[in-house]
């Protein structure tokens, strides 16, 4: 018999997100030249997290890389919503114990030539009243440019496809399509950006296999995003470009407060940490009545957000 003891997945995920958080913060600080403010917080029985935030940076107008490790009991409303995707959840329970560990990041650059980006990876488990554990992974990463550079979209998607392919060749086509559907701003009838990968309620393989997949994807972010930022952060732009960026930021805010699952879950949790949950919102955004894009490069983005394309 082997003497090797494998840590519970929840503990492995906790360590991973804390490591990835500091890795990403260091990588983005190298791009910006300004440090992130790191705010460690605690909550309830052993719950804690670290909010790493940059605001009014040299390159990044606003951004945050947050981790949270929380446990407690889900209220009946949250339990009911989760039952839709998990048949095994106890239908008679009014509340259930849960554990969640996740990392969430949104970065809004100053320069409209540089894309906003988002990342989220999480592990969730519930314990039914009979003691049975129900678990799943969720997450993904996506790119939201204002000015579309096809080479950036190809690079970002290519690296995430390679990460997916190392674990299951069906993952990228499935999760790319899922991202296109999930990031749809329904009332606008267009997507938030140019997608990436997205998955949720993922429990179809051994948990250790899925953890390895999530770990690979999480470490893919910096090489997928930093080269794009280095090319775009100092490019010249016009007032029209900036106006278009602010309009797109408004769309971003609409999606996050109306449709984003993480925002909804965070605000439903007992005593939500609102500052961290709403960290995803841009510092500045704009809504103009009957706005029409003025330049062809702005219209080029809309072709892709209205009809998502294959990038690789």
Swiss-Prot record:
One Pfam family here: Coprogen_oxidas
Xref: PROSITE patterns: COPROGEN_OXIDASE (PS01021)
Site (Important for dimerization): 187
Superkingdom in the source lineage: Eukaryota
Keyword Ubl conjugation assigned: no
Protein localization: Cytoplasm
One of the record's GO cellular component terms: nucleus
Pathway linked to the protein: Porphyrin-containing compound metabolism; protoporphyrin-IX biosynthesis; protoporphyrinogen-IX from coproporphyrinogen-III (O2 route): step 1/1
Keyword flag Iron-sulfur: no
Binding site residues for substrate: 104, 120-122, 271-276
Keywords per UniProt: Cytoplasm, Heme biosynthesis, Oxidoreductase, Porphyrin biosynthesis
Residue ranges of the region described as Important for dimerization: 53-62, 252-288
GO biological process: protoporphyrinogen IX biosynthetic process
Active site: 118
Chief subcellular location: cytoplasm
Reactions catalysed, as given in the entry: coproporphyrinogen III + O2 + 2 H(+) = protoporphyrinogen IX + 2 CO2 + 2 H2O
GO MF, any single term: protein homodimerization activity
EC numbers: 1.3.3.3
Assembly behavior: Homodimer.
Family: Belongs to the aerobic coproporphyrinogen-III oxidase family.
Function: Involved in the heme biosynthesis. Catalyzes the aerobic oxidative decarboxylation of propionate groups of rings A and B of coproporphyrinogen-III to yield the vinyl groups in protoporphyrinogen-IX.
PANTHER family the record matches: COPROPORPHYRINOGEN III OXIDASE, MITOCHONDRIAL (PTHR10755), OXYGEN-DEPENDENT COPROPORPHYRINOGEN-III OXIDASE, MITOCHONDRIAL (PTHR10755:SF0)
Name this protein carries in UniProt: Probable oxygen-dependent coproporphyrinogen-III oxidase
Organism: Schizosaccharomyces pombe (strain 972 / ATCC 24843) (Fission yeast)
Species lineage: Eukaryota, Fungi, Dikarya, Ascomycota, Taphrinomycotina
Originating gene: hem13
């Amino acid at each position: 018999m082997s003497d090797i003891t494998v840590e519970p997945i929840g503990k492995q995920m906790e360590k991973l997100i804390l490591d990835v958080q500091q890795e990403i913060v260091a990588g983005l600080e190298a791009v910006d030249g300004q440090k992130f403010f790191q705010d460690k917080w605690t909550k309830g029985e052993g719950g804690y997290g670290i909010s790493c935030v940059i605001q009014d940076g040299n390159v990044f107008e606003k951004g945050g890389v947050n981790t949270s490790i929380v446990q407690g009991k889900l209220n009946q409303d949250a339990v009911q919503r989760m039952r839709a995707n998990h048949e095994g959840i106890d239908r008679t329970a009014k509340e259930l114990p849960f554990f969640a560990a996740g990392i969430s990041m949104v970065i809004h650059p100053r320069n409209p030539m540089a894309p906003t980006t988002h990342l989220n990876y999480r592990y969730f488990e519930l314990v039914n009243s009979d003691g049975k554990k129900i678990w799943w992974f969720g997450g993904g990463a996506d790119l939201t440019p204002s000015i579309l550079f096809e080479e950036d979209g190809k690079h970002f998607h290519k690296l995430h496809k390679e990460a997916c392919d190392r674990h299951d060749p069906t993952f990228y086509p499935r999760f790319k399509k899922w991202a296109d559907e999930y990031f749809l701003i329904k009332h606008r009838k267009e997507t938030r950006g140019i997608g990436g990968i997205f998955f949720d309620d993922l429990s179809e393989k051994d948990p250790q296999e899925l953890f390895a997949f999530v770990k690979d994807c999480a470490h893919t972010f910096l090489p997928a995003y930093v080269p794009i930022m280095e090319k775009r952060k100092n490019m010249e732009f016009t007032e029209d470009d900036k106006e278009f960026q602010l309009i797109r930021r408004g769309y971003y805010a609409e999606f996050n407060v109306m449709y984003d699952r993480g925002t909804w879950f965070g605000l439903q949790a007992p005593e939500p940490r609102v500052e961290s949950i709403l960290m995803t919102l841009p510092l500045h955004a704009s809504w103009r009545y009957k706005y029409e894009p003025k330049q062809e490069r702005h219209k080029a983005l809309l072709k892709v957000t209205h009809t998502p394309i294959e990038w690789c």
